Curated annotation (Swiss-Prot):
Span list, region Cys-rich copper-binding 2: 46-79
Region described as Cys-rich copper-binding 4: spans on this chain: 121-142
Molecular functions (GO terms): metal ion binding
Signal peptide: none
Stretches the record annotates as Spacer B2: 80-88
Protein name: Copper metallothionein 2
Gene: CMT2
Any single GO CC term annotated in Swiss-Prot or TrEMBL for this entry: cell cortex
């Protein structure tokens, strides 16, 4: 059987098993990820159908296996090579793919959120992720708030909502719950 240098080209590719056997995709025209020759043809171009053909924005065209995505640009949740990190923790629908710089986590389910510390204790919805400088804690649920060294606390006993972290000079305590109230 003679080799046919110009195999049948079709954009539908997958309509029948016979079409699949003869299918090669012209550049930029591959629409079916099951086309057996979609990635075996040098001229197939950005076919988005298999291992050799990558897409930069993770549109995936129905085939997550073919997709690689730059950070923050994944559009399909099922893409197995989804961006390993996004800078704003939008997470793209997959918390497992997200890491966040300090103070920039927007999704509570981000698994790496607790590893990132914020300096102002706004906590971004997750008290477990927060460390606060003396006198700068504004969220009472911050676990690092009560651990601050009393010597570093303000002397007017503002207490920022948590009395246990405050020390006050005699006659200057403003909060009754302060355990260190003037002795």
């Amino acid at each position: 059987m003679a080799f046919n240098p110009n195999p049948e080209k079709t954009t539908s590719c997958c309509s029948t098993s016979k079409a699949q056997d003869k299918c090669t995709c012209p550049k930029g025209k591959c629409e079916c990820e099951t086309c057996p020759k979609s990635t075996k043809t040098p001229g197939s171009g950005p076919c988005n159908c298999g291992v050799k053909e990558k897409v930069s924005t993770c549109g995936c065209n129905g085939s997550g296996a073919a997709c690689t995505c730059p950070p923050g640009q994944c559009a399909c949740d099922s893409c197995p090579r989804k961006a390993k990190s996004v800078s704003t923790c939008g997470c793209g629908g997959s918390a497992a793919a997200c890491s966040c710089p300090p103070g920039k986590c927007a999704c509570d389910s981000c698994p790496k959120q607790a590893q990132e510390k914020v300096s102002s204790c706004a906590c971004n919805g997750s008290g477990g992720a927060c460390t606060c400088p003396p006198g700068k804690c504004s969220c009472s649920g911050c676990p690092a708030q009560a651990k601050e060294n009393p010597a570093d606390q303000p002397t007017t006993c503002g207490c920022q909502g948590v009395g246990v972290a405050c020390t006050c000079p005699p006659g200057q305590c403003a909060c009754d719950g302060c355990p260190a109230k003037a002795k």
